[in-house]
Each structure stands twice: as structure tokens, then as C-alpha cells.
Amino acid sequence: MYHQLILMALIGVIMANVVPFSMSNIPEEYKEFIPEEVKNFYKNLTQEDRQILRELASKHATFTNEDAALEALKNKSDKLYQKAVELRNFVKAKIDSLKPDAKAFVDEIIAKVRSLRPEDGQKLDMEKLKQAARDIIAKYEALNEETKEELKATFPNTTKIITNEKFKRIANSFLQKN
């Protein structure tokens, strides 16, 4: 469960620092890849909500688990807490619906992403990120077809992204070893 909050916080940090919290500022060709649930989460965020997410994301190392992080969020904004819980429950239900092989793959991805989190004051190690992406791709390719199909059915927007030719070109150039 803690890993799901980290993913939500990561989404929050990325959205807070890269995307200016306005769906209208996202290029049209990328909007289709954003899950409706994520769009809905960010759709009506206030400036105060965005600031709360930034603040809590910057303190991620101080939270012992997901419940502690959610409690901190609840103390800052009950409305935002409710929205975060709704999004968390949506993600949890999707993961819990998977068969063991697919669930193990998703859990492994989440653990790998968590391991990439830099120490306080440190920057993300891009080479470690690239290697993690290569490892995940290799593990995905090694899955049997039934598991791949289950993942595609459960996470259709992710499938759209990874099968998009433009995305593949960008990812391939990013993942090339220096």
C-alpha cells in the first residue's frame, strides 16, 4: 500500500513541477494517454492543493508508511485526502484484481520504482533509472502471453502508451546506453 502512495506522490511531484496542473496545457497527442481517474484527480485542484502535494512529496522520507502519509494529507486538507484515497482505492482494486503472475510483475515494478527514490537532497540517478527501465522491459518481454494480455486489459492506458510508435522512439533514444 505504501508504494501506491509513493506513486501518487510521484505523480503529484511530476505534475506539480512539470505539468502546470491544467489539462489544457498538455499537448493533445498526449492527453489520450492520461487515465481518466488521474485527470479527474487533478481536474479541480486549487493552488493550495498543489502546494500541499508539493510539500508532502518533499517530505516523503519522513513517512513510515502509506497511512502516515495519508494522515499528514488529511491534516492538511480533508477534501484532498478524500480524493487521494479514492485514487488509491482505484489503483489498489486494479492491482488486487490481477492473477498471481501479473500481480507479481506489477509489485516488482513498484518495488523497483521505489528503490530509485533518491536520498533527501540528492538527484535522481538517470543511469539507474535507465537500467531499471531496461530491466522492467526485459521482464515484461519474458512474461507469457496470457499475463501480458491480462496486463493490457487491466491497464489499457499504459498499453496505449507502450505501444505508441512515437512513445517507443522517444523511449528507445532515452534508454540507449551512453
From Swiss-Prot:
Q: Please list which residues make up the signal peptide.
A: 1-16
Residues carrying a glycan: 44, 75, 157
Q: Whose protein is this, by species?
A: Onchocerca volvulus
Per its record, what are the GO molecular function terms? fatty acid binding; retinal binding; retinol binding
One short Pfam family name for this protein? Gp-FAR-1
In which tissues is this gene expressed?
Localized to the adult body wall, in particular to the lateral chords. Found in the epithelium of the uterus of adult females.
Posttranslational modification, per the record?
A: N-glycosylated.
Coiled coil, from the record: 67-89, 122-154
Give the protein's function. Answer: Binds retinol. Also binds the fluorescent fatty acids 11-((5-dimethylaminonaphthalene-1-sulfonyl)amino)undecanoic acid (DAUDA), dansyl-DL-alpha-aminocaprylic acid (DACA) and parinaric acid. Binds long chain fatty acids, with highest affinity for arachidonic acid, linoleic acid and oleic acid. These long chain fatty acids can act competitively to displace bound fluorescent fatty acids and retinol. May compete with host albumin for fatty acid-binding.
* Name of the featured protein: Fatty-acid and retinol-binding protein 1
Q: Which domain of life is it from?
A: Eukaryota
The record's section on InterPro entries has: Gp-FAR-1
Which gene holds the coding sequence for this protein? far-1
Protein family (similarity comment): Belongs to the fatty-acid and retinol-binding protein (FARBP) family.
Please provide, in alphabetical order, the Gene Ontology terms of the cellular component aspect for this entry. Answer: extracellular region
Keywords of this entry: Coiled coil, Glycoprotein, Lipid-binding, Retinol-binding, Secreted, Signal, Vitamin A
